[in-house]
Curated annotation (Swiss-Prot):
Family matches, as InterPro entries: Kunitz_BPTI, Kunitz_BPTI_sf, TFPI/VKTCI-like
Miscellaneous remark of the record: Negative results: does not show inhibition on elastase and chymotrypsin.
Organism for this UniProt entry: Vespa bicolor (Black shield wasp)
Compartment(s) of residence: Secreted
Principal cellular location given in the protein's record: secreted
GO CC aspect terms: extracellular space
Protein name in the entry: Kunitz-type serine protease inhibitor bicolin
Disulfide bond residue pairs: C28-C76, C37-C59, C51-C72
Keywords: Blood coagulation cascade inhibiting toxin, Disulfide bond, Hemostasis impairing toxin, Protease inhibitor, Secreted, Serine protease inhibitor, Signal, Toxin
Domain BPTI/Kunitz inhibitor: from-to ranges: 28-76
Length: 77
């Protein structure tokens, strides 16, 4: 019985070593687009692996300028 558990554990570790993680979408690696205009719009952007709220100035935006946290998380995690 212990040999089966050990074999299972070794198998799990072996699979874990060779699992390839998918790289983040390039969109998710961009800095938050603050914008240069005078607006003060609440938006979400991926920062250090989390979708965080920031204030967007209203122009010169990028594709990672999400209106909702759920949409940011759906695209970037």
């Amino acid at each position: 019985m212990n040999a089966k558990i050990l074999a299972l554990l070794i198998g799990v570790v072996f699979v874990g070593l060779f699992t390839v993680s998918t790289p983040a979408h390039p969109l998710c690696l961009l800095d938050p687009p603050f914008g240069f205009c005078q607006s003060s719009i609440s938006r979400f952007a991926p920062v250090v692996g989390k979708c965080r709220e920031y204030i967007y100035g209203g122009c010169s935006g990028k594709a990672n300028n999400f209106q909702a946290q759920a949409k940011c998380q759906a695209n970037c995690g």
